[in-house]
Amino acid sequence: MKANHRIFLVLTILIALGCEHSAAQEKKLPNIVILATGGTIAGAAATGTQAAYTSGAVTIDAMLAAVPGIKDLANIKGEQISNVGSQDMTLDIMLTLAKRINGLLAQPEVDGIVVTHGTDTMEETAFFLNLAVKSEKPVVLVGSMRPSTAVSADGPLNLFDAVGVAVDPNSAGRGVLVVMNDWIHGAHSLTKTSTTAIQTFMSPLRGLVGVSSYGKNDFYNRPQWTHTTASEFDISNVTRLPRVDILYAYADMAADLIDASVANGAHGIVIAGVGNGNMNKASLEAAARAAQKGVVVVRSSRVVTGTVGRNVEVNDDQMNFVASDELNPQKARILLMLALLKPRTTGEIQNLFYTY
């Protein structure tokens, strides 16, 4: 009996030590929080080859279950912020997301954030977070072009790589990142370029920040624009962002679109201009009238790459316009909304476009 009792005690001690060792090993892993917002990565279709699907149909727990080995990279917790297709992403959700990220990253035990997001408006949310997050810890957005039920779905590996980037110390201080199909992009430069191809995101002006392969990363570029902790924008007490409209320029553009935007309460207007941010004479005159009424007019371009220069084809000084520099229309809108949270001159807003 005594021998059996001693054996029992030894086994109990060994089991306890094993549990402590396992717990210690678990604690050594970085702590990552995945914030889910919906999108194709959480989408589901009736069959594996069906193009039509329902966005945001899969929960964060189900997504994690579909990624073997992901929990070997980090201790992962998941939260559902929203569950929408990104065409339905709202400014309210963006504000909620940014505030939650700031709250989580203020906790010493949280090492990084991964946000699952639809690709349609991912670049807008990424750029917003790049200006609103107040931490150098990694924040990584990830999505997919194929739903979770598709043959050769791209979401699981994208999510694995995103967590791999989030746990990498070399990701810190680079601003908000986007990981899609082995590529690591900075929030300032990336844009969606294809409606269907899985390699849809490109960074045409500044190039990739790095590459990721099965959780292994190679960084070779650092974002050159002001972001996160160096950003002057504070959304901690912001509940609503000013209305800013985007108007698309085209041959024989109807100038009354600009007048209608002003009449409906826009505080700012971004023109997705032709070429170097240009528009026809009637629209230029309407935009000048809007600027005279205190509406901030930003000239961007509908062209995928290139910069919009100040006083190049349009006399911005005379018309009191802002040139978007490198920002495409959708990102110019994000920056302008944040700029309008407090009174600024047109010159001050122009400097923001040279900074962010």
Protein language model regions, located:
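ATP/NTP phosphate-donor binding region
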Residues: 25-103, 285
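Internal gly/pro-rich beta-alpha loop/helix module
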Residues: 142-213
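C-terminal non-catalytic interaction/assembly regions of soluble proteins
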Residues: 276-356
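Bacterial N-terminal signal peptides
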Residues: 8-18
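Accessory alpha-helical/coil subdomains and C-terminal extensions
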Residues: 29, 35, 59, 63-70, ...
